[in-house]
Design a protein with these regions (language model features):
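N-terminal signal-anchor transmembrane helix
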Residues: 60-115
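Membrane-embedded multi-pass helical conduit in multi-pass membrane proteins
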Residues: 65-67, 77-80, 345-440, 470-538
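Cell-envelope/extracellular polymer assembly enzymes that use nucleotide-activated donors
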Residues: 84-87, 117, 258, 273
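Loop-to-transmembrane boundary segments
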Residues: 97-98, 328-351, 449-484
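Acidic donor-binding/catalytic loop of UDP-sugar-dependent glycosyltransferases
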Residues: 100, 127, 177-194
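Acidic donor-binding segment of Leloir-type glycosyltransferases
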Residues: 104-150, 154
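Long helical/loop segments within the catalytic core of UDP-sugar-dependent glycosyltransferases
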Residues: 136-173, 185-268, 279-280, 301-344
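Catalytic donor-sugar/metal-binding loop of nucleotide-sugar-dependent glycosyltransferases
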Residues: 266, 275-293
Length: 547
């Protein structure tokens, strides 16, 4: 009689076939793990696990968003009565192309003039000073309650300008708009009623984009920011977690600013810094996803990278400054944990840089260990680390554009590649933030670029605020070339799935580097061509007018 133990010990022909067909090990008896391989694989898997940890957090945000979907801010039952006095602050610095548009839109805000004050806080050092002053004087003559305040220094940068303006502000509530924003006429009508709750310290509205369709770069930026506003702000605000004022398109209760210690300029994200300090003081924040404020996206790759680096460094600085106080505070652990994820999320950029350095040797080592191990270990970690990006950002498009979101699918590879392409710039920024390196607040130049508006592209070609190409672009091109070799190696070994995945690194690094390096030359050439075409058209236009 055959015992059960003997049956268990016998070879199962099905398992033998499965192992032979689906788990081949052609290097059995040839390949052995050595110390060098362990030195490659240990940090490789550690980085993948941490990235998967942060990637999985996006799914947690999605869960919070949909679980608390019913808890959207409702219109207040009682309006503010009497209406309070409001100050609108417009901080600008060298904004010759957009400052007049900003002032015109701010003066169009619908609110009793006797209760409204508009401050133009100008730190400019170029002809923006004359443009802004003349524009303010013109609207003041028309009866608008607007004042022009100019500083001869940039002490504290934007935070310093806001703090100095606050000293002379007369409003109980402070609305703030950056130079690249177009305040809607009904902004105060839609936001002020929410302050009928005396515990509300700040109301943030959602950004929308006047030049969303200008280029692939602006489309990608819009989708990335949509993900932030729809799911990050939506999930955090609905679940009662801390979230941040975005520096513009929002309105503060003055008392909340003062209780939190006012504007401080020891971080590059003074808005997030003040937001967390105010919420630690007990003030409630509201996010209104249905109230939009138009803005202008950067159209230049170098400007976009500078903006992203400033945000990455600023959040790390804010985390260093405030996370100890957040952990010690009496707020619930779920709020502390969400604040940790928010303020440390940019640590993923240095980890991505390490992964970029290790991925080719790790793939070679894993190939000799057998591809099935890559299938059930590496692939799930890769999906956890990066797959949530697709769900997160495409989900935001489905929320905002339910009838048109599928058209956004074509931008998904560019979204993934852009995130990869930013790793070098943002890694440098994050390391500076971690080690306390202070740097200047570098503003993002704006050019009054609007979709389908005549002269927008010519204005960009001829602008004086173009960002210079940084040495990082050359590093990105070198790394992109390295990944081109990695793709060649993967395809040569019939590792097609890995090769396709590595193509994202090629597109990300090479695309970002080449676009940063040559955009100025391409646009200069395009500007010359546009100028020549305009010169050729001029005589014909003149003759048509005379006839």
């Amino acid at each position: 009689m055959i015992s059960p133990a003997m049956l268990l010990a016998a070879e199962n022909p099905v398992l033998v076939y499965f192992q032979r067909v689906f788990m081949p090990d052609p290097f059995q008896g040839i390949y052995q793990v050595n110390t060098f391989d362990l030195l490659i694989l240990a940090p490789y898997f550690l980085v993948l696990v941490v990235l998967a940890f942060y990637g999985s957090h996006r799914y947690l945000l999605l869960y919070k968003f949909y679980r608390n979907r019913a808890s959207r801010p409702l219109p207040p039952v009682e309006a503010l009565n009497p209406l309070p006095r409001v100050t609108v602050q417009l901080p600008v610095y060298n904004e010759r192309y957009v400052v007049e548009r900003l002032i015109e839109e701010a003066c169009g805000i619908d609110y009793p003039r006797e209760l409204l004050e508009i401050q133009v806080l100008d730190d400019s050092t170029d002809d923006t000073v004359a443009l802004a002053r003349n524009c303010v004087e013109r609207f003041a003559r028309l009866g608008h309650p607007i004042r022009y305040l100019h500083r001869d220094n940039r002490e504290g940068y934007k935070a310093g300008a806001l703090a100095e303006g606050l000293q002379s502000a007369t409003g109980e509530f402070i609305a703030i708009f950056d130079a690249d924003f177009l305040p809607p006429t009904d902004f105060l009508e839609k936001t002020m009623p929410h302050f009928s709750d005396p515990g509300v310290g700040m109301v943030q509205t959602r950004w929308s984009y006047i030049n969303r369709g200008y280029s692939v770069l602006t489309q990608v930026q819009a989708i990335l920011l949509d993900g932030h506003f729809v799911f990050e702000h939506g999930a955090r605000s609905r679940s009662g977690c801390f979230f941040n004022f975005n520096g513009t398109a929002g309105i503060w209760r003055r008392q909340a600013i003062e209780d939190a210690g006012g504007w401080q300029h020891d971080t590059l994200t003074e808005d997030t810094d003040l937001s967390y300090r105010a919420q630690l003081c007990g003030w409630k924040f509201l996010y209104l996803p249905d109230v939009e404020c138009l803005s202008e996206l950067p159209v230049e790759m170098n400007a976009f990278k500078t903006q992203q680096a400033r945000w990455a460094k600023g959040l790390i600085q804010t985390g260093r400054k405030l996370l100890p106080a957040i952990w010690r505070s009496p707020v619930p652990w779920r709020i502390k944990l969400e604040a940790f994820f928010h303020l440390t999320a940019n640590l993923c950029y240095p980890l991505m840089s390490v992964l970029a350095a290790l991925i080719l040797p790790a793939i070679i080592v894993r190939f000799y260990q057998g591809w099935f191990q890559m299938l059930y270990i590496d692939l799930p970690l890769m999906i956890a680390a990066t797959g949530s990006v697709s769900t997160f950002y495409l989900g935001s498009q489905r929320e905002l554009f339910p009838g048109d979101w599928r058209n956004k699918l074509r931008f998904l590879p560019f979204i993934l590649a852009t995130g990869i392409g930013l790793t070098i710039t943002n890694t440098c920024a994050v390391l500076e933030g971690l080690f306390g390196h202070q740097s200047e607040f570098v503003r993002t130049p704006k050019y009054r670029i609007e979709d389908r508006v005549a002269g927008s592209r010519t204005r960009f070609f001829q602008n004086v605020y173009r960002r210079r190409t940084h040495w990082v672009a050359l590093v990105e091109i070198l790394i992109g070339s390295y990944f081109t070799f990695a793709v060649y190696h993967a395809l040569g070994n019939e590792n097609y799935a890995t090769g396709m995945f590595l193509c994202l690194f090629v597109i990300g690094y090479l695309g970002t580097g080449l676009y940063s390096l040559f955009q100025a030359r391409w646009d200069r050439l395009a500007g010359l061509v546009a100028g020549q075409i305009a010169a050729l058209r001029r005589p014909f236009s003149k003759s048509l007018q005379e006839s």
